[in-house]
A protein has these predicted regions:
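Extracytosolic helix-loop segments that constitute the early lumenal/periplasmic catalytic or substrate-binding loops
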Residues: 40-70, 74-77, 81-94, 274-288, ...
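Membrane-proximal stem/loop segments at transmembrane-domain junctions that anchor or position
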Residues: 51, 258-361
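Loop-to-helix entry region of an early transmembrane alpha helix in multi-pass inner-membrane enzymes
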Residues: 73, 77, 88-122, 154, ...
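Transmembrane-helix signature of polytopic, membrane-embedded enzymes
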Residues: 90-103, 121-147, 165-166, 180, ...
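Membrane-interface anchor segments at the N-terminal boundary of transmembrane helices
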Residues: 103-115, 331-415
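Membrane-interface transmembrane helices that cradle and orient dolichyl/undecaprenyl
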Residues: 131, 171-187, 197, 216-221, ...
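Membrane-interface alpha helices of multi-pass inner-membrane proteins
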Residues: 141-146, 186-201, 212, 237-241, ...
Length: 460
């Protein structure tokens, strides 16, 4: 066996042991489940998919649900497939997985989450190696990914974050190969990977133009015409899955949309822009800083601020106000999807008309999005969320500096994924910290690359 083949075997075995071992601790010693609020939607969709092949958010008790486009189909389809293959008894209620952790539904969610986490760790390690990291950096990435409190929590709940993290990490790996190898197969894999991610979370559509730009820039050894053809193939393959699903939605709902929530997301951000303009930037920053002393000081200094008041009675905050209007606009006889799209257009109009206000709000929203990673429960009452966030941000900045200084296209392709997702959420959503969870494997990979260094390979 050749030396490099031996190293590859050791690499694969090491990653498999670290990834599977750490991930499957979720099955035997799961941490405390923290509901995120979307579990019922995904369980309903998965149950109907497994029972009748219909994508619907109707209550589980509904025997003949009407097809809809309320959520992206990726995770419900995967969970339904796992249920069918495993012969799992379908959940009788949306809350069964949480009320009874030993139920078949709950166990299957954890098993699927563990497999996705192990896959994410393995692909993340391969991406780090492709970006120029050595064996130590790759194995360290796998260990950090599977130890991540936020990713482990995502593996426990029926939601799209775990699947999105696996696919996002695959996109980074494929992009690294695509910008350094002129063969068409890596362009095809890049396009397919980038095309599948929006079927789990619509925000990842931003990866399609990002990937097209990368294919135009590298490999530098190719003439411009060759790079244009590669970018065109990538874009075609990346757009195809979303276009197919949107065509399905056009047939069943009458609207060419990816999911029936994009307008709500944009309008919630527009309402947040208005609230920050009224109440100030600093109260928002204080409310979203994960340090209890800072939050208390902010509440004392600005008692009129309502950023943390998720109350459905009374004024509430930007989120409850926007959602109340969203529901009001969708009441029969209105077309709910048309109402959602109308609110989305209204929000985009506000962003353009009040650009400075939007940019000021973006600073606060970007701050909020930094805190995706959780502090380990074992360290309570010590909370390291803030420290970990700054550490991850510094690592990405450091890795970015290495990429620019060395004109390292491999490292640039690796970082393009988390940076594009971060900017998208900072500009267009309220950026709940969990929105950044799918990018955490690459953030931890940036840590190992920043600490261990990345070997330069400018591409061919």
């Amino acid at each position: 066996m050749r030396p490099h083949s031996t190293r590859a075997v050791y690499f694969a075995v090491g990653i498999a042991i670290v990834g599977l071992g750490a991930a499957f601790t979720l099955l035997f010693a799961p941490p405390r489940i923290v509901p995120i609020g979307d579990e019922a939607d995904y369980l309903r969709a998965a149950t109907h998919q497994a029972r009748s092949g219909v994508h619907s958010s109707a209550p589980i008790s509904e025997p003949a649900p009407r097809p809809d486009a309320y959520r992206e189909p990726g995770y419900p389809f995967l969970l339904a497939t796992a249920w069918r293959l495993g012969g799992v008894d379908l959940p009788r209620t949306e809350a069964e997985w949480l009320d009874d952790p030993s139920s078949p539904a709950a166990r299957s969610v954890r098993l699927l989450g563990a497999l996705l986490l192990a896959l994410t760790a393995a692909v993340g390690a391969a991406a780090v190696q492709g970006a120029g990291g050595g064996f130590v950096a790759s194995v360290a990435t796998a260990a950090l990914v599977t130890a991540s409190p936020a990713l482990r929590q995502a593996a426990l709940t029926p939601g799209s974050e775990g699947l999105t993290a696996a696919l996002v990490t695959l996109v980074a790996f494929a992009w690294i190969r695509g910008v350094t190898h002129p063969t068409w197969r890596w362009v095809a894999l890049s396009g397919v990977a980038a095309g599948l991610v929006p079927l789990t979370r619509g925000a990842t559509l931003v990866l399609i133009p990002t990937g097209a730009v990368l294919m135009l820039l590298a490999p530098r050894a190719l003439p411009l015409g060759g790079r244009l053809r590669r970018a065109a193939l990538f874009s075609l393959l990346a757009l195809a899955p979303s276009a197919a699903w949107m065509t399905r939605n056009l047939e069943v709902t009458g609207s060419f949309v990816l999911a029936d929530r994009s307008g709500a997301v944009l309008y919630s951000r527009a309402e947040l822009d208005r609230q920050i303009a009224r109440e100030g930037l600093l109260p928002a920053v204080a409310a979203w800083t994960p340090v209890e002393a800072v939050r208390r000081a902010g509440a004392s200094r600005w008692p009129e601020a309502t950023f943390s008041r998720y109350e459905w009675r009374g004024e509430g905050n930007f989120f409850t106000r926007s959602l109340r209007r969203w529901h009001a606009e969708r009441r029969p006889p209105a077309d709910p999807i048309a109402a959602d799209r109308r609110l989305g257009r209204e929000a985009m109009g506000e962003f353009i008309a009040s650009r400075m206000r939007h940019l000021v709000a973006t600073a606060a929203v970007a701050w909020r999005g930094l805190f995706a990673e959780r502090s380990p429960e074992s360290l309570l009452p010590l909370d390291l969320t803030c420290v970990v966030a700054f550490f991850l941000a510094a690592a990405i900045v450091r890795a970015g500096a290495l990429a620019l200084r060395g004109r390292n296209f491999r490292l640039a392709a690796f970082l393009a994924v988390p940076v594009a997702l971060f900017l998208f959420h900072a500009l267009l959503t309220e950026f709940l910290p969990r929105f950044a969870v799918p990018a955490l494997p690459l953030a931890w990979g940036a840590v190992t690359l920043a600490l261990c260094g990345a070997h330069r390979d400018p591409g061919r």
